Amino acid sequence: MVAQQQGKFTVGDYLAERLAQVGVRHHFVVPGDYNLILLDKLQAHPDLKEVGCANELNCSLAAEGYARANGISACVVTYSVGALSAFNGTGSAYAENLPLVLISGSPNTNDPSQYHILHHTLGHPDYTYQYEMAKKITCCAVAIPRAIDAPRLIDRALRAAILARKPCYIEIPTNLAGATCVRPGPISAITDPITSDKSALEAAAKCAAEYLDGKLKPVILVGPKAGRAGSEKELIEFAEAMGCAVALQPAAKGMFPEDHKQFVGIFWGQVSSDAADAMVHWADAMICVGAVFNDYSTVGWTAVPNIPLMTVDMDHVTFPGAHFSRVRMCEFLSHLATQVTFNDSTMIEYKRLKPDPPHVHTAEREEPLSRKEISRQVQEMLTDKTSLFVDTGDSWFNGIQLKLPPGAKFEIEMQWGHIGWSIPAAFGYALRHPDRHTIVLVGDGSFQVTAQEVSQMVRFKVPITIMLINNRGYTIEVEIHDGSYNKIKNWDYAMLVEAFNSTDGHAKGLLANTAGELADAIKVAESHKEGPTLIECTIDQDDCSKELITWGHYVAAANARPPRNMSVQE
């Protein structure tokens, strides 16, 4: 009887069961003839729901957003024409430390040995190229050669993704998805975490406490990896034990409570908020918890802290004169919290430097809409049930300046920086968190890259509010390096929603040219639960934040640096 049951169990069934066991509830797909049998197997699993996407780029970005909400996601595409497009969102998941399982169908196992030239390929019989490419953008890539190998390879890839907080790649030939294999063993073999080495953890905490005892003005800088490591609770515990000022990198907004008395703002060099920049430069030591220093977060390398750094990463700790491997962030912060000496010198200084709250002008109803008025009205929308997505561009700066109430979530893609990311990512996120109000701030140029996924929001009746700021161009590129290529064709965005509705959709597209029209549109959006609401907010092309102008200037200068050690002939 057991043998008979196992004979009915297939590679596709194995993958479906493992995905369900690790917590996947929705899998994002674009069908193609190399993955159709596999899709049938995934569809048949009672705990998995298939979510079709408009294209493979959007599919991968929707899975990226889902991983933000769920901790792990799955994207299923066809060979080459599908996977190569999905590599973009997979790259985002790698850069942003998100476990995304990219699954691709592939040619029949008989074709390579017979030197067949197949469709959807490069036109030669070597079909390893996609697998080789996937190795560069995942923590683990596997190509299943035989059904008997599937359990071992699938388990290897999933465990690697979960432990590394990075994407993995699983390639399944079209004739193996329905081939028989054994049933899976206990899921703990995949999901059991690797804990800190006890000796390394104790030594790291002891040395770190001694190191910090010698500092007069320490400050904590929180980066995006703190959230990916799930260390928010331990971070608060450690910060309160230290008593010092806590600043956040822009990509870490929302990972430390903004109403906490030790929160001093966003550290972003010349475009920092509150007094964060002054506090960082006044400090004599910085504890970097999950920090990422790249050209964007350092404003073109002009805002790299010039003080000793203690780096607390997801699995190791480094500070001047010491390095400790296999030390998990959560455990280290908890251990260190019990050993540090309370030192609130930076908070005393912050109280002296803390700026007064800025005056916020409330526009009259008939006033033309402006960027500041949009931000003011969005601020009033934020609650403890809000998840705010900000796309690459001025939406970054507008979103960073908003005050998050306790419980509100903030999502940004600053390492990968893909314009248009927010539309499919918010869709994927909202499917996993239907209890939250997902709001998107996106520019018109970014929206045009991934606009098709609004149709899936309509299809699945996802009540996302899209605040589309229409200033007729790629404003962020204008500030970095202007040119005619930054001009785009204007769309009637509000009317576009009607095309997505067709005869059975319930999305709403609204146009706001004035402050009053925006206020009215927001009321409609907040009461509409049968699909997305897109509010096209028209503003002047030159109406952008001064922070974007400043930041763009420095990033442009960094991009324009001449090659090193190159002689220049007159």
From Swiss-Prot:
<dbReference type="InterPro" id="IPR029061">
    <property type="entry name" value="THDP-binding"/>
</dbReference>
<feature type="propeptide" description="Removed in mature form">
    <location>
        <begin position="1"/>
        <end position="2"/>
    </location>
</feature>
<comment type="similarity">
    <text>Belongs to the TPP enzyme family.</text>
</comment>
<feature type="binding site">
    <location>
        <position position="473"/>
    </location>
    <ligand>
        <name>Mg(2+)</name>
    </ligand>
</feature>
<feature type="region of interest" description="Thiamine pyrophosphate binding">
    <location>
        <begin position="394"/>
        <end position="476"/>
    </location>
</feature>
<dbReference type="InterPro" id="IPR029035">
    <property type="entry name" value="DHS-like_NAD/FAD-binding_dom"/>
</dbReference>
<feature type="binding site">
    <location>
        <position position="120"/>
    </location>
    <ligand>
        <name>substrate</name>
    </ligand>
</feature>
<dbReference type="GO" id="GO:0005829">
    <property type="term" value="C:cytosol"/>
</dbReference>
<keyword id="KW-0210">Decarboxylase</keyword>
<keyword id="KW-0479">Metal-binding</keyword>
<dbReference type="InterPro" id="IPR000399">
    <property type="entry name" value="TPP-bd_CS"/>
</dbReference>
<dbReference type="InterPro" id="IPR047213">
    <property type="entry name" value="TPP_PYR_PDC_IPDC-like"/>
</dbReference>
<feature type="binding site">
    <location>
        <position position="444"/>
    </location>
    <ligand>
        <name>Mg(2+)</name>
    </ligand>
</feature>
<dbReference type="GO" id="GO:0004737">
    <property type="term" value="F:pyruvate decarboxylase activity"/>
</dbReference>
<dbReference type="Pfam" id="PF02775">
    <property type="entry name" value="TPP_enzyme_C"/>
</dbReference>
<keyword id="KW-0963">Cytoplasm</keyword>
<comment type="subunit">
    <text>Homomer.</text>
</comment>
<dbReference type="InterPro" id="IPR047214">
    <property type="entry name" value="TPP_PDC_IPDC"/>
</dbReference>
<keyword id="KW-0456">Lyase</keyword>
<comment type="pathway">
    <text>Carbohydrate metabolism; pyruvate metabolism.</text>
</comment>
<keyword id="KW-0460">Magnesium</keyword>
<feature type="binding site">
    <location>
        <position position="33"/>
    </location>
    <ligand>
        <name>substrate</name>
    </ligand>
</feature>
<dbReference type="InterPro" id="IPR012001">
    <property type="entry name" value="Thiamin_PyroP_enz_TPP-bd_dom"/>
</dbReference>
<protein>
    <recommendedName>
        <fullName>Pyruvate decarboxylase</fullName>
        <ecNumber>4.1.1.1</ecNumber>
    </recommendedName>
</protein>
<feature type="binding site">
    <location>
        <position position="471"/>
    </location>
    <ligand>
        <name>Mg(2+)</name>
    </ligand>
</feature>
<dbReference type="GO" id="GO:0000949">
    <property type="term" value="P:aromatic amino acid family catabolic process to alcohol via Ehrlich pathway"/>
</dbReference>
<dbReference type="InterPro" id="IPR012000">
    <property type="entry name" value="Thiamin_PyroP_enz_cen_dom"/>
</dbReference>
<dbReference type="GO" id="GO:0042802">
    <property type="term" value="F:identical protein binding"/>
</dbReference>
<keyword id="KW-0786">Thiamine pyrophosphate</keyword>
<dbReference type="Pfam" id="PF02776">
    <property type="entry name" value="TPP_enzyme_N"/>
</dbReference>
<feature type="binding site">
    <location>
        <position position="477"/>
    </location>
    <ligand>
        <name>substrate</name>
    </ligand>
</feature>
<dbReference type="InterPro" id="IPR011766">
    <property type="entry name" value="TPP_enzyme_TPP-bd"/>
</dbReference>
<dbReference type="GO" id="GO:0006090">
    <property type="term" value="P:pyruvate metabolic process"/>
</dbReference>
<dbReference type="GO" id="GO:0030976">
    <property type="term" value="F:thiamine pyrophosphate binding"/>
</dbReference>
<dbReference type="GO" id="GO:0000287">
    <property type="term" value="F:magnesium ion binding"/>
</dbReference>
<dbReference type="Pfam" id="PF00205">
    <property type="entry name" value="TPP_enzyme_M"/>
</dbReference>
<dbReference type="InterPro" id="IPR012110">
    <property type="entry name" value="PDC/IPDC-like"/>
</dbReference>
